[in-house]
Amino acid sequence: ACAEYLKRLKPMVSLEMVEIAEESLGGGESPALIRRALEREGEKILKRIGGRAAVVPLALEGRQLDSLAFAGELDPGKNLSREQLVFIIGSSHGLSPQVYQRADWRLSFGPMTFPHQLARVMLLEQIYRAEMILARRSYHK
């Protein structure tokens, strides 16, 4: 499904999907190990982001938007700079505080937790839907 939305988006936007491997916890799940792993992941993520990028991590406490409002957030004439727009899906333990501090705003798909693969498809579909809305083409119903 990701490949299909990437193919559909290719004529509309320049899009790159980058995956950063989840850090190993070394056999434990203590809060300290999780915090250190998130810090290491966060450093890797932040190194990949340009200084002028608009950053939007997915987070449970983020803004829940309908498709029209999401399209409005992606509208280059109204809100975020589209020089580089970076959406971030965290690891199974979330994201580091440093990544959240770098965020321009946070997006939420609701209080449920989704596997990374499904969240990725949902995000790509919503980006595609937003681009269709902004182009005033029929897709969004």
Model-identified regions with their sequence ranges:
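S-adenosyl-L-methionine/SAH cofactor-binding core of RNA-modifying enzymes
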Residues: 14, 21-86
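Glycine-rich, flexible N-terminal cofactor/catalytic loop recognition
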Residues: 1-14, 21
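Structured adenosyl-cofactor binding patch, chiefly the S-adenosyl-L-methionine
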Residues: 97-141
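Rossmann-fold NAD(P)-binding glycine/threonine-rich loop
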Residues: 90
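Hydrophobic/aromatic beta-strand patches that form the interior of the parallel beta-sheet core
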Residues: 18, 56, 105-107
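Residues at alpha-helix caps and immediate loop-helix transition turns in enzyme cores, especially N-
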Residues: 1, 69-70, 99, 119
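Short, surface-exposed alpha-helical segments at coil->helix boundaries
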Residues: 3, 42, 97-100
